Amino acid sequence: MQQPILQVFHKKLKMNKLSSSAVRIEGKKFIPGIAWFFLVLVLICLPGQELPTVNDWLGKIYFDKWIHVGLFTILAFLFMLPLLKSKLPITEKWSYVIKIAIATSIWGLTTEIIQKFFVPGRSFDIFDWSADSLGALIALLFSKIRFLKK
């Protein structure tokens, strides 16, 4: 007798869950990402008067935005890398990479809110958040191209 489709689907789902839950990623592999997270937090909490002044030409090329892109690209990628190197199924890796990119963008928004309300001489800048989100997107695209080719 044939099994109902939902029962077969449920069994497949259960098998996938079992196989992926058997994959463990050591917490210590996330230490670089955690350290970078706190470095970014310290940097965004610097009062405005303690920041170096930007030369005229650096301002013209939006140097501060490129700093944001770099900081958040590295942040997202450091959290993605342990998952990308794991033995998780590729669909799960991709799911986690997307979630990390979204979380990184949300963290960028959160840092702007922290600056506006808690850091003297700093303010909320939508373009900083855009640069942070671009950094997360770059990490996501790099991960997709380099690690998730299938």
Regions inferred by a protein language model and the residue ranges of each:
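Bulky hydrophobic segments
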Residues: Q2-G121, I126-W129, S133-K150
